[in-house]
């Protein structure tokens, strides 16, 4: 379990030495006169830095930090850095200097900005926001020279240390201000193309003279291009085929993907409302058949079919939103018959529509409209002959007309990790389609209303592969007595469910007999309602009331309820993500006295290659266990199962902390002072 950290207390005196809540360095002394070829620690006026490929040189009468190609300099540890400002000059024009931060002692880095540096005199300057959160108390900042030679000087970094006494905050966990940060840094752009809603086709795609046509930018893109979209609403233009669909046919490379991304701090919306006429139903918003694309921060709405249909491979769709489309928000795969898409190829060998990652995306209020409307549109789908290696990471789907996720007619394994789904199949959510589309005859709503549907058989054959759901949540799917939260849907090849939670569904879990016992496993899951388990092996799960048959049995915790959670309210589930894409931090978390704390086992995840690859690629998925065992369900609590007491940083000299009630709230008491769960001192 994750211990409460009080680094703000431990860093109080160290941070105060920077003075005026700022960190400064002007490189006037102690830099080597020649650049070291390996990482070297140097003591400067501001503290110990780490450098490689940089040295001190006189420029315009003052010492500067001189950086050769790929040289870098790393600051000392900083507490909650805010604005990073510095001066710069280069040996030529168009040089690039990347600025990154690390919150894990340099194991991983997140780009916060890239400066374009010229040879102008006097020095230019750049300023980037770190967007620190309250837990970011040990942060490193790295400056990297992407093209030699660059001089930097006069670095100033504001510090927003939580070591200062601050009043308690009722709900500090939903930080939405600031530019969104991708889960890994964008690679350096080879070329940049700018779009803006008020741009023009006769512009040149620069920041000053942007285009406004996404298709125009895509056609001009080559590997390494960044298409940067300013905020506002775009209405895609009719193309030469008389359709509004934006087609992505060209490809990037593994090292140089083509990126379409939101301009920092802004949200571009691509509204395909011009498709919403009877004769255009079936036209998609974006159709991606190319490979190695990365879409970040886009909102796709009002497409006459899928918001995005993804058929290419090695693509990354991140922080995108899909809403009010006339079919599934984001769909991977082809059609019922694979050879219809690839004549002469009878089946997918795994390389088509393969290795795509869908990360931190939201999909809601999508609904198809025909004679039996609502029966096809899901939040997300990977179906009809997908390839290998497709994953959904930390996505949400709600209020879609059919299902939240649909893995119908799959050909290979599909993985879901920390995904949330709720309230599918409610007709009242989808009256909006009648404002746009008119159909003759008696229209009836036919949404199935299932949550996470992990399989399905149709005219294109039976679904194949072992499907995985790690730490996922499904709730509120109950439009009839037969709908389910997690549903095998007659899939026979097997499932692995670890750390999932289901409640308020007609059936929380439905896994019928006839599937693969050897490939079906349930570990550390929680069921607050009904289940029907007819296949597979189970261990370390929890249920409200044990089933007399067709239910979990081994190491089973019973008599659990919604009272075991801080919140299971939809309003909490819908709250904004943080700037890093993280989901709301109250929903689905256990209370301090839940019997599900320390009641599970981490052995299963640790032995699974699929899970180990996930946490290697996405370290934020890792569940850090510091108690005696894993908690049941999706999230680890910060409480001890036996005493409710945690210690600070495992220090033998540290005073114990206690969780106590104060003013009807749980707070932390230490040495007579009170702190909230962010480590901030509560001031009366």
Give each language-model segment a name:
Residues 240-243, 255, 418, 461, ...:
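Predominantly extracellular beta-rich ligand-binding scaffolds that present long acidic/polar faces
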Residues 239-249, 274-286, 302-309, 324-353, ...:
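Extracellular beta-strand/beta-solenoid scaffold signature
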């Amino acid at each position: 379990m994750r211990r409460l950290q009080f680094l703000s207390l431990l860093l109080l005196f160290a941070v105060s030495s920077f003075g005026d809540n700022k960190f400064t360095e002007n490189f006037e002394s102690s830099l080597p006169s020649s650049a070291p070829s390996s990482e070297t620690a140097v003591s400067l006026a501001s503290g110990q830095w780490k450098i490689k490929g940089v040295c001190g040189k006189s420029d315009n009468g003052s010492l500067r930090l001189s950086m050769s190609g790929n040289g870098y300099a790393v600051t000392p540890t900083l507490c909650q850095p805010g604005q990073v400002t510095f001066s710069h000059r280069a040996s030529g024009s168009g040089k690039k200097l990347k600025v990154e931060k690390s919150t894990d002692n340099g194991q991983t880095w997140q780009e916060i900005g890239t400066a374009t540096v010229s040879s102008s005199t006097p020095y230019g300057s750049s300023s980037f926001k770190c967007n620190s959160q309250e837990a970011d108390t040990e942060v490193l900042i790295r400056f990297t020279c992407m093209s030699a030679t660059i001089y930097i000087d006069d670095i100033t970094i504001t510090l927003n240390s939580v070591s200062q006494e601050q009043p308690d905050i009722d709900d500090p966990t939903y930080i939405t201000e600031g530019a969104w940060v991708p889960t890994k840094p964008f690679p350096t752009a080879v070329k940049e193309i700018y779009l803006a809603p008020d741009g023009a086709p006769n512009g040149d795609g620069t920041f000053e003279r942007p285009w406004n046509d996404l298709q125009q930018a895509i056609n001009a893109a080559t590997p390494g291009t960044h298409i940067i979209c300013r905020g506002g609403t775009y209405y895609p233009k009719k193309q030469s085929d008389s359709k509004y669909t934006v087609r992505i046919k060209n490809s990037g490379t593994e090292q140089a993907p083509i990126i379409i991304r939101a301009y920092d701090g802004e949200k571009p919306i691509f509204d395909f409302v011009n498709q919403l006429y009877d004769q255009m139903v079936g036209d998609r918003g974006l159709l991606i058949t190319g490979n190695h694309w990365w879409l970040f921060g886009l909102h796709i709405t009002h497409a006459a079919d899928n918001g995005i249909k993804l058929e290419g491979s090695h693509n990354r769709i991140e922080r995108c939103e899909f809403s009010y489309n006339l079919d599934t928000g984001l769909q991977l795969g082809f059609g019922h018959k694979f050879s219809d898409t690839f004549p002469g190829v009878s089946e997918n060998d795994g390389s088509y529509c393969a290795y795509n990652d869908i990360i931190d995306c939201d999909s809601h209020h999508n609904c198809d409209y025909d004679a039996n409307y609502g029966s096809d549109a899901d939040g997300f789908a990977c179906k009809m002959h997908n390839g290998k290696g497709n994953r959904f990471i930390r996505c949400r789907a709600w209020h879609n007309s059919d299902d939240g996720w649909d893995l119908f007619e799959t050909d290979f394994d599909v993985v879901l990790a920390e995904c949330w789904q709720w309230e599918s199949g409610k007709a009242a959510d989808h009256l909006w389609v009648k404002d746009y589309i008119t159909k003759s005859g008696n229209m009836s709503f036919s949404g199935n209303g299932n949550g996470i549907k992990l399989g399905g058989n149709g005219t294109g054959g039976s679904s194949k592969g072992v499907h995985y759901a790690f730490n996922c949540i499904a709730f509120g799917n109950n439009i009839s007595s037969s709908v389910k939260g997690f549903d095998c849907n007659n899939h026979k090849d097997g499932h692995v469910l670890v750390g999932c939670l289901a409640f308020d569904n007609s059936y929380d879990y439905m896994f019928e007999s006839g599937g693969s016992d050897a490939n079906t496993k349930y570990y550390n899951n929680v069921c607050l309602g009904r289940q029907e388990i007819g296949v597979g092996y189970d261990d370390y799960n929890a249920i409200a009331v044990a089933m007399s048959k067709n239910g979990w049995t081994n190491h089973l915790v019973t008599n659990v309820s919604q009272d075991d959670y801080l919140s299971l309210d939809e309003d909490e589930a819908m709250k904004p993500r943080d700037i890093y894409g993280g989901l709301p931090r109250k929903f689905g978390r256990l209370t301090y006295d839940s019997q599900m704390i320390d009641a599970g086992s981490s052995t299963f995840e640790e032995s699974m290659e699929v899970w180990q690859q996930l946490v290697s690629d996405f370290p934020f998925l890792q569940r850090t266990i510091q108690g005696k065992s894993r908690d049941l369900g999706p999230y680890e609590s910060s409480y001890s199962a036996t005493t409710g007491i945690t210690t600070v940083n495992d220090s033998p000299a540290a005073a114990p902390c206690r969780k106590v009630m104060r003013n009807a709230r749980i707070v932390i008491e230490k040495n007579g002072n009170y702190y909230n769960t962010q480590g901030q001192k509560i001031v009366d």
